[in-house]
Amino acid sequence: MSDEVSTIFYKPFKDAKPYKDDTGIDYKPFYLPYYLLNLEEWLAFLMASDRAQKPFWDKVLQMTYKFYSIFNCEQKNDKKCEFEFINYFKWKILGIIDLILSQLESDTAKITAARGIAGRCLNIINALSKNEELIKFISEISSRCGLIYGNNNSELQDFTNEQRTNIDEDLAWKIEEIKLTHGNYYDYKFLNTAVEMVLLEEEARGNARIREFTSTMLTRLDFFLNNNECRFMRESEQKYDNTSTYLREMFHIGANEQNNQLITIDSSEVGTDVLELMTSVVSRMIYDYRKEKIGPDRRQQPVHLLLDEAHRYIRKDAQYILRENIFEKIAREGRKYSLFLVVSSQRPSELSDTVLSQCANFIVHRIQNEVDLKYVYAILPYFSEDFITKIKQSVPGEALIFGNCVPMPLQVQVIQAKPDPNSKNCNVEEEWFRQQ
């Protein structure tokens, strides 16, 4: 498998899987379903702080899964599901109102907050289903948010107490205990609604600055929901039951047939942060899949990850969006699970020391930059000044090979690829004076 960041290799690799489906070339589209991201990967993509915002986003994902579960059921015109949906939301709204009534002291503060909550809850219901019973229920709450000379005379409290007698608490708790586990499908279209519901709960608990604390994260969420760059995460040709199914269907990893032994992902049009997330998530899935193998299976059907322009993924001294760079982990531990890393870069001095320290073999093409030459000289054993001269003087197609794969350093002529990659240099002088 290769994470290729440009389209120059289309000719030799016609079975590539780019993330986009509108290239005009006979590609198969690449998808990375958002619901296969784990919590840490979501937090990294949203640039959320691990301590403060992790519990918030976990609640959002859990609420999204609940919304999807009960609303998906309601769409089937199942009266039982519809009752569960209405019962749960009434219970949830009453819980938020009760929090406000218990947290605040004056009737003016209580009623002002409750009126605002009712308005936002109405927006949530309208976004979900426009259920008439729930809309009427919220309207009745709003109608009891009146003040006479600054007093509500317990009108709202009496109404909520009365309504609680009509709520099936056990059924509501049953839905509340529905938990999202990694790999379960949920519809991303419920994310914004779930965010608003969790924000309302946090504000009702007295966390008045929760919207301020989550503003950056929610801006990134809007980017995911609306930007074409994330379309390959939102849209997919099929639902995948789990990571293993995804790897088998998308990359034929774990499949019995051997028809797709080399797969190229064209990631040339995604931004740096999305690129890092995309490659990290796919590599993490493959790592976890290989790690689950036991006995002889662990040594069968090995997987090689080829990283072209590797300085985009494994930069030296870089702040990765994910706390632990998966490629460094694969470099350290992948051998035990028959998962191997092939790193290609024109700037070796920019690569992670951790990854390079685990590399057993090196193929060095022509290098002119002194910084890169010194770096190669420092990391390679048995590397002498003579080899530096050979590297400087080498012509396209020549390379020096070092490492465990050869008994001694070798200078070789690489066989020319047929067909050639689409990477020939432009003849500038000829193009300048070309007659139209």
Per-segment meaning from a language model:
Residues K11, D266-E269, L307-E309, I401-C405, ...:
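Flexible glycine-/small-residue-rich
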Residues A48, L322-R323, K329-I415:
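Conserved ATP-driven motor cores of ASCE-family P-loop NTPases powering translocation/secretion/packaging/pilus
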Residues S2-V5, E257-N260, R299-Q301, K336-S338, ...:
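Short, well-ordered loop/turn elements at secondary-structure boundaries
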Residues M1, K14-I326:
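P-loop NTPase motor domains
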Residues S6-Y10, L262-T264, F362:
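Conserved beta-strand scaffold positions in the cores of enzyme catalytic domains, especially
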Residues M1-D21, L32, D353, I401, ...:
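Glycine-rich phosphate-binding loop of nucleotide-binding enzymes
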Residues S280-S283, A360, Q416-K418:
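Short, solvent-exposed amphipathic alpha-helical segments in soluble enzyme
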Residues A127, N131-L134, E140, P396-Q436:
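Conserved P-loop NTPase motor module
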